[in-house]
Amino acid sequence: MSNKIVITVDGPSGAGKGTLCYALAEKLGFTLLDSGAIYRVTALAALKSAVELDDEIALAALASALDVQFLPADGEVKILLNGENVSGQIRTQEVAEAASKVAVFPEVRKALLQRQQDFSTENGLIADGRDMGTVVFPNAQVKLFLDASAEERAKRRYKQLQNKGISGNFDQILAEIKARDFRDRNRAVAPLKPAEDALILDSTSLSIEEVIAQALSYIQQHLDIKA
């Protein structure tokens, strides 16, 4: 794994990691790993099978047995659980909240660690998550940490819901983001934090195009490659 190029992108929910990682994978021709989706799939599987979200042992067993696939399709990544396309289902607020709760358990993280590391490929990997640079790929050649204020992330989420014709309460969204940040940053195992050697990008006042440009420039300098 040490001879394969791995670029990690960590950061809180709503900072723009997904958009950045997809753009980087497309421009560099790398494979994309959305680790957050793996936790969301685990949470969805738990909700579907009535496994309690506080049952660490049952959740870890469920995570170990997951039949999940990531397939590029129509400009995005299609996610299959037991052969079923669950790309839309895992993006609901209910599943997002469940995933944040599931992710605090050490046994669940252990069960999913090897699965994530197995995504490392010969043509390079963009790993999107919360502990990619600190735990899953500590020897990655390039590490980025994408951040934004809770208020800005809530605005983005609120706008996304509006664009989809879904009603949303801004104050509730902001409260949920802050609560999730607290859980992610204060969990006992693999808390959300930048790797010591990560470049920190604050996207609060940046367009996604500016974020992509800064990230690409940093990657090209460190890896001596061109997009």
Swiss-Prot record:
<dbReference type="GO" id="GO:0036431">
    <property type="term" value="F:dCMP kinase activity"/>
</dbReference>
<dbReference type="InterPro" id="IPR027417">
    <property type="entry name" value="P-loop_NTPase"/>
</dbReference>
<keyword id="KW-0547">Nucleotide-binding</keyword>
<feature type="binding site">
    <location>
        <begin position="11"/>
        <end position="19"/>
    </location>
    <ligand>
        <name>ATP</name>
    </ligand>
</feature>
<dbReference type="InterPro" id="IPR011994">
    <property type="entry name" value="Cytidylate_kinase_dom"/>
</dbReference>
<comment type="similarity">
    <text>Belongs to the cytidylate kinase family. Type 1 subfamily.</text>
</comment>
<dbReference type="InterPro" id="IPR003136">
    <property type="entry name" value="Cytidylate_kin"/>
</dbReference>
<dbReference type="GO" id="GO:0005524">
    <property type="term" value="F:ATP binding"/>
</dbReference>
<dbReference type="GO" id="GO:0005829">
    <property type="term" value="C:cytosol"/>
</dbReference>
<dbReference type="Pfam" id="PF02224">
    <property type="entry name" value="Cytidylate_kin"/>
</dbReference>
<protein>
    <recommendedName>
        <fullName>Cytidylate kinase</fullName>
        <ecNumber>2.7.4.25</ecNumber>
    </recommendedName>
</protein>
<dbReference type="GO" id="GO:0036430">
    <property type="term" value="F:CMP kinase activity"/>
</dbReference>
<dbReference type="GO" id="GO:0015949">
    <property type="term" value="P:nucleobase-containing small molecule interconversion"/>
</dbReference>
<dbReference type="GO" id="GO:0006220">
    <property type="term" value="P:pyrimidine nucleotide metabolic process"/>
</dbReference>
<keyword id="KW-0963">Cytoplasm</keyword>
<keyword id="KW-0808">Transferase</keyword>
<keyword id="KW-0067">ATP-binding</keyword>
<keyword id="KW-0418">Kinase</keyword>
